[in-house]
UniProtKB/Swiss-Prot annotation:
Localization annotation: Cell membrane
Cellular-component GO terms for this entry: plasma membrane
Residue spans crossing the bilayer: 7-27, 53-73
Membrane topology: Multi-pass membrane protein
Lineage top rank: taxon: Bacteria
Keywords for this protein: Cell membrane, Membrane, Plasmid, Transmembrane, Transmembrane helix
Protein name as catalogued: Uncharacterized protein pXO2-65/BXB0087/GBAA_pXO2_0087
Lineage: Bacteria, Bacillati, Bacillota, Bacilli, Bacillales
């Protein structure tokens, strides 16, 4: 049973950051389009570095806020307990490792 729990934690550690990244990128794209429309800036006028900065800032912000909320929830007086260990301290460490792996992989792809 412990092996399946470890496998589940590894899958969650990689799936949660990837899922958060793609969801926040979709939200970030909408916010970026709205922001550029308000300022009346053509997307083609942005430099490559500005495009990458705009594209990654909002996903990083959403992931950071999500992890902060889950950490604060875990540290609260009544932390949520699931039988799979979804919100255990070990899983939070795995999330950190998973986020590191995902962003290292993304930085290698973009370079």
């Amino acid at each position: 049973m412990k092996i399946w729990k470890n496998i589940l934690n590894i899958i969650l550690a990689l799936a949660v950051p990837i899922g958060l990244l793609f969801i926040s990128m979709m939200i970030g794209e909408g916010v970026l389009d709205l922001f550029l429309d308000i300022l009346n800036i053509n997307y083609d006028d942005l430099s490559y570095l500005e495009e990458k900065a705009f594209a990654m800032f909002i996903p990083l912000l959403i992931i950071a806020l999500t992890l902060l909320v889950t950490f604060l929830h875990h540290r609260s007086l009544r932390p949520l307990r699931l039988s799979t260990g979804f919100l255990s301290k070990e899983t939070y460490k795995n999330y950190g490792i998973g986020i590191g792996i995902v962003f290292i992989f993304l930085s290698l792809i973009q370079s």
